[in-house]
Curated annotation (Swiss-Prot):
Keyword Isomerase: no
Gene Ontology biological-process entries: bacterial-type flagellum-dependent cell motility
GO CC aspect terms: bacterial-type flagellum basal body, distal rod, L ring; cell outer membrane
Membrane topology: Lipid-anchor
Keyword Transcription regulation included in the entry's annotation: no
Name assigned to this protein: Flagellar L-ring protein
Amino acid sequence: MKTLTLISLIMVTLLSGCSPISREQVRPGDPAFAPVPPQTLMQPAPVDGSIYSSAQNFSLFGDRTAHQVGDVLTVVLQESTQSSKSTGTSMKKDSENSFNEATILGTAISAHNLSLLTDQNFERDFSGEADADQSNSLSGSISVTISDVLPNGVLRIRGEKWLTLTEGDEYLRVSGLVRPQDIGVDNTILSSKIADARFAYSGAGAFGDVNRAGWLQRFFNSEWFPL
């Protein structure tokens, strides 16, 4: 009984050690996706006796699209990917060995009137086949802010959107690099024009946990399981 208990404890310890590390809990307000406030500019001194004030000017012909740190930009998500892969492997190996009948001084050796003539045949077969199909689509829109302006004029953007549900949360996170000339007159940009794009759409709380396999099932599906 003690031996069985000890074996059970060892197996539980090994399974716990082989289970994948749990993912870090995702929470809103991550500094990596937080909005960046605009840069503070020195306000010019007011000029007395003048109708025009440079502190409150508004250009009728200037570019009103996002181009500075802290400006808001709308990303239109139009992502669609599809992949298909099929592999097949087949191996076969046959071998045959024959041993002549043993003799001593020309007389065949036998045991219980049975000849010692031996033939050995070996045959090994292996076949494997795998098919994988995957498709993903993401559509919608999200407003992000410009977090940095690179020396070449490229804009670095980032932002997140959270939707609180009854049993958890859904979140969407976006980051990447944008060229100012790709921004439309309505201050929007297509997701396909974002370089080094990072899109994350998932769930947190009970909503995300229900779609995730337990640690024991993940162990049987991992490389640690020998079968």
